[in-house]
Amino acid sequence: MSSFSLLELLAPHLHYFKNLPFADILLTIAVTLFSHWLLNPSYESLVCHLPFVNNRKWYEIGYFKAKSRFLANGAALINSGFEKGDVFRMVMDNGVIMVLHPKFANEIRTIEGLSFSESLAEDFHAQIPGFDPFTSEKLIHDVIKTKLTKKLEHIVKPLSEDTLVALDEWLVGFQANRDWTTFPLRKHILELVARLTSKTLLGSVIGRDPAWRNIMVNYTVDAFVAAYILRLFPKFMRPFAFRFIPQCRKLRKELDEARRIIDPVLEAREKQNVPLDMLPNAPVQDAFSWLEQCANGRVYDPVIAQLSLSVVAIHTTSDMLTQVLFDLVERPELISALRREIVHIFGNDWIDLTRGSLQQLKLMDSVLKESQRMKPVNIGTMICVSNHWMWDPAIYENPEKFDPYRFYKKPGTMSYDFASKFVSPSPEHLGFGLGRHVCPGRFFAATEIKIILCHILLRYEIQLPPASKPKVMKVGAALSADLDAKVLLKRRWQEVVLR
């Protein structure tokens, strides 16, 4: 990837400043640069005895250039850091980060003093209005771990049924057409995952509301842009600067819209004397009930809590599923092998999906884990353990090659063990984190992805347009599925009908 400047990165958003007087723009930039350079000693003081990678040059004012270098070539900079030692610090887009070799993963996996949620709250300015869903809150972790994961067996069938309905509506006018049709994959997968997730968490009324789904899809993206712009200001200026940044105002507007949608549902429940903390065996369970049960008297904001669940559930899952489909369309023989596995597991008849049957899709599980190995979701923040072991030839044979059978049978054995499963993390495969810092929603994500994959592979032929090859987008240490790549879909006869 060629080098680019911070100005180029933010170019799409500069039109927000077009109505400001030129003198005001210059003054704002000058004050920001000077204060950022003069009043941000934390960059220099953080564990100063460690090797420093990508520090600012002596002639650079502030850390804008250093951050731009990281965004343009983050992976190479991290690799250069490990040439200096197993622990080093470097300037990333969100400040100075201590980077650890993956051999330390087991040592820090249980350290209570480290918190991903708190680093997320710091990164995304959770104390500033508009960024409230990024607040460090154990309640969300408890809901995912003790409610959502434990209810998966009961969620699978309705999730499968909703997938069928969503696919039919998504491809309306296409069902009877046997010709190839072009689709922008990432956009449609994001909308599909948002729809299914919102229905699971919030039920039919809100879950099928297009306005709510738009908020779920847009809020996270808008928050990333707003958070990045706000990081350009030193901390002492952020509580004032956010009031004048258009992207921050947009976040507050989206939160107001979320309240407009959710508050009437809460009021209706109250009028109907339906308590939020419905009994665990009640016929209807949703995230409102789970939040109230897990809160156990703690004060929380139901609207912010619902958006917090959406932030952690939608974009990472849709990015993962998009990348898996891109990996598959480049390997038609693998699509055929997966279809054979699905038919073998489910038979040749109408059949209901269950969590147990999904767990028998071991080749699909291996494909998911290999896709994640090649393009993990993230590397963490503040203090992070590098995940470069995921591409280490000393650990994985031909690590640069996509091998869908890599985790299907453990090397040297004829068995498939727990460590090979998609949801099982290890220091050698940090796609979901590790230990107490592991992603609690990985079981729901794996279930949702497998259900969608089963239906898409059975119902549609899928391939790339001629001379097309999706690229993994690299910005800093983050890897993302191609945002613009398209696929061709065509309706096919399906060997088994899943419900």
Question: Where do the protein language model's features map onto the residues?
Answer:
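C-terminal helix/juxtamembrane-tail motif
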Residues: 1-17, 461, 477-499
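Conserved cytochrome P450 K-helix E-x-x-R motif and the immediately C-terminal K′/meander segment
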Residues: 67-79, 348-384, 394, 419-426, ...
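Cytochrome P450 heme-thiolate monooxygenase catalytic core
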Residues: 157-321
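Classical protein tyrosine phosphatase
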Residues: 315-340
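N-terminal membrane-proximal hinge/A-helix region immediately C-terminal to the signal-anchor transmembrane segment
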Residues: 2-140
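Cytochrome P450 heme-binding "Cys pocket" and the immediately downstream C-terminal segment
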Residues: 334, 424-425, 430, 436, ...
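Conserved cytochrome P450 K-helix/beta-meander segment immediately N-terminal to the heme-binding cysteine loop
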Residues: 384-419
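Charged/polar low-complexity intrinsically disordered regions
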Residues: 91-96, 102-105, 110-202
